[in-house]
């Protein structure tokens, strides 16, 4: 017998609805609730916390006493102003709100190269998440490659859980990283954090101006070929954890018609978007790290709850954290040589098996979708979209509901 799916129309109207239960969403919900607002929080994970806070570090008991949490739920459409359509495992729900805070976070940027679709080649954060969920990595040979501080955090975690981390391949130049490190002198907390990462990685090779050019194996990954200073070599490994920075998850804000900036969703001083009563906070406005996400979430929470003076007290802290985020972006920006990674027969869209040669025959996203089905598979362009924006300069196509894959029955509104 198939599982039954119930349709529910919520009679409650929340003052503030927060989408996303990562650091920015948690901070927003906390400040809105303490300001007296009736708050709902929606997240597609089983527990709040996002990719940063999990398990015992998540303040779940407090949240559930102050905020109505809809875990394991995801927004797939906005059928009318002030209404969200949610899908859960066995039910659909319409949630009503007066103000909306979108803290949808970011995802890893993947760049295609020969062999990147082999089993055991995965995102750096993805491998860490799987390890947290029980994937056995003890004794496994792992190469961590890509760009940014996330590589260090992932390598430290994997090593701490028994993995044999062979090396970290950072595509940024040592000079750029050195300049970034000098800037940490003005931020003692960040400097201490960086020192702790390095201490946890003693004995692991950290190679700058280095990146993977091919993953090799028959049925699964067996080795990765790396390039540095014009030389190449092959490193045997069981896993390749690869990530070239992060991409803001702007699909839901785009569905609402929010204006975009060069870095993400455009917001004003109070984190309000171009659409009235809709706010954005955290990585969705631009990649900035944990501290910036927290303060942006607090500002959005206060503002959405009608406390602009409290929000204004946090502007200085946000400015400082934005300066750090800008330095981070400049230091670890993907180099131009990475555009040469995919070969003609390299799959760019792994969902629909579309090669780079076929995609290059098109001039934009819409044409590629029509002629090759690129971006029309289960991930809806979330993997190939970021890659093609970097490789070919294509901007994301317009967003239409459902924002995420949804059951056919979910698309029929209740009642």
Residue ranges and their predicted role:
Residues 11-24, 140-145:
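Beta1/beta-strand and adjacent pyrophosphate-binding region of the FAD-binding site
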Residues 16-38, 154-158:
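N-terminal Rossmann-like FAD-binding beta1-loop-alpha1 element of flavoenzymes
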Residues 34-51, 166-175:
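Glycine-rich FAD pyrophosphate-binding loop
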Residues 62-88, 95, 161-251, 261:
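A Rossmann-like FAD-binding core segment of flavoenzymes
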Residues 106-143, 147-154, 262-269:
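Glycine-rich dinucleotide-binding loop and its adjacent helix/turn
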Residues 122-131, 239-288:
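FAD-site-proximal beta/loop scaffold in flavoenzymes
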Residues 272, 302-341:
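Active-site-proximal substrate-binding core of FAD-dependent oxidoreductases
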Residues 281-316:
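A conserved FAD-binding loop/helix module that cradles the flavin
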């Amino acid at each position: 017998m198939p599982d039954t799916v119930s349709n529910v129309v919520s009679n409650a109207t929340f003052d503030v609805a927060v989408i996303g239960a990562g650091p920015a969403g948690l901070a927003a919900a906390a400040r809105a609730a303490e300001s007296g607002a009736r708050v709902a929080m929606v997240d597609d994970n089983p527990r709040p916390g996002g990719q940063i806070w999990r398990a015992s570090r998540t303040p779940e008991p407090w949240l559930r006493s102050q905020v109505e949490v809809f875990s394991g739920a995801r927004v797939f459409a906005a059928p009318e102003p002030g209404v969200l359509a949610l899908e859960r495992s066995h039910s659909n729900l319409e949630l009503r709100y007066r103000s909306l805070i979108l803290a949808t976070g970011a995802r890893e940027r993947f760049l295609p190269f020969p062999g990147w679709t082999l089993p055991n080649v995965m995102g750096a954060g993805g491998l860490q998440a799987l390890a947290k969920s029980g994937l056995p990595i003890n004794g496994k040979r792992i190469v961590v490659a890509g760009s940014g501080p996330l590589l260090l955090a992932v390598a430290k975690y994997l090593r701490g859980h028994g993995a044999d981390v062979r090396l970290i391949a950072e595509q940024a130049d040592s000079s750029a990283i050195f300049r970034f490190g000098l800037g940490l002198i003005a931020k003692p907390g960040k400097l201490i954090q960086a020192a702790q990462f390095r201490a946890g990685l003693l004995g692991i090779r950290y190679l700058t101006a280095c990146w993977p050019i091919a993953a090799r194996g028959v049925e699964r990954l067996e080795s990765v070929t790396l390039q540095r200073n014009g030389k190449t070599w092959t490193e045997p490994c069981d896993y390749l954890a690869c990530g070239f920075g992060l991409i803001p998850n702007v699909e839901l804000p785009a569905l609402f018609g929010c204006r975009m900036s060069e870095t993400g969703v455009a917001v004003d001083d109070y984190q309000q978007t171009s659409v009235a009563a809709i706010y954005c906070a955290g990585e969705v406005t631009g990649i900035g790290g944990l501290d910036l996400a927290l303060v942006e979430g607090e500002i959005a929470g206060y503002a959405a709850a009608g406390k602009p003076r409290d929000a204004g007290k946090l502007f200085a802290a946000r400015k400082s954290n934005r300066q750090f985020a800008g330095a981070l972006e400049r230091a670890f920006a993907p180099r131009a040589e990475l555009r040469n990674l995919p070969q003609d027969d390299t799959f760019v869209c792994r969902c629909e098996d579309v090669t780079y040669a076929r995609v290059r025959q098109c001039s934009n996203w819409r044409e590629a979708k029509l002629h090759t089905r690129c971006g029309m598979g289960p991930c809806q362009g979330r993997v190939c979209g970021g890659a093609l924006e970097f490789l070919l300069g294509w901007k994301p196509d317009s967003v239409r509901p459902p924002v995420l894959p949804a059951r056919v029955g979910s698309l029929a509104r209740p009642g």
